[in-house]
Amino acid sequence: MLELTHVTRRYGAKPAVSDVSLTLSPGKTYALLGPNGSGKTTLMKMVAGLIRPTSGEIRFDGQPIGPATKAQIAYMPTESYFYPYMSIEDAGRYYRDFFEDFDMERYHATLARMELNPRDKIRALSSGMNAKVRLALTLSRSAKLMMFDEPLNGVDILTRAQVVDEIIRSRREGRSMLISTHLVDELEEHIDAAICMKNGVLARMGDRAELVGEGTLTDLYLKIYGPAGREAASDAEAGQV
């Protein structure tokens, strides 16, 4: 379905993503793991077609990322991108005008489940409410691949539960999902595979059961990115491993 081949993205001389090759299969839910600055957001934006790779190739269903793939990939960014004077309803109309696959009826139903008033202004929303609006907009598309960049960041426990419920609801429809998150415990049981980024490089990828063994994704995260992982990387660079 989605295939990245030797993909690199540089900002000036510094690579944000370096020589990443991977393939995502249809119908699976992937956790995209890594600390801040590891290249997760850059990778997602390239897949969404918002920025271009410096080198390498990204294909979706055999087609290069571009206008032809826009309707197949939905992306929820970390930042709000609406004008403060807009209402939640206006945001839906904006999406409807921009994306042919946007379902306004589904949008209203999702807003109702998450207790959001379509008449409320964007400027009056808390960070958690804003995140729920962005989630509702993303889930109201009929894309094959849904990407969520830190959907649980900056939201309270109750809002997290609502966000997770909506993602799971959409997952049951057989869509493929790529979820960037630090809060892996919240989604652990729904993750099929994990992609681990470190300093812009693909550090590890595989089915969750194979990667974690008897442990959890949190254990895997600490192993790769915690003190032990940093020491192992330093030893390897020094030729001690």
Residue spans of the language-model regions?
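Helical segment within the ABC ATPase nucleotide-binding domain
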Residues: 160-173
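Conserved ABC transporter NBD signature motif
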Residues: 56-69
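The feature captures the beta-strand-to-loop junction immediately N-terminal to the Walker
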Residues: 33-35
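Helix-to-loop junction immediately C-terminal to a conserved catalytic motif
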Residues: 48
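Catalytic Walker B motif of ABC-type/P-loop ATPase nucleotide-binding domains
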Residues: 146-150, 155
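ABC-family P-loop ATPase nucleotide-binding domains
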Residues: 78-133
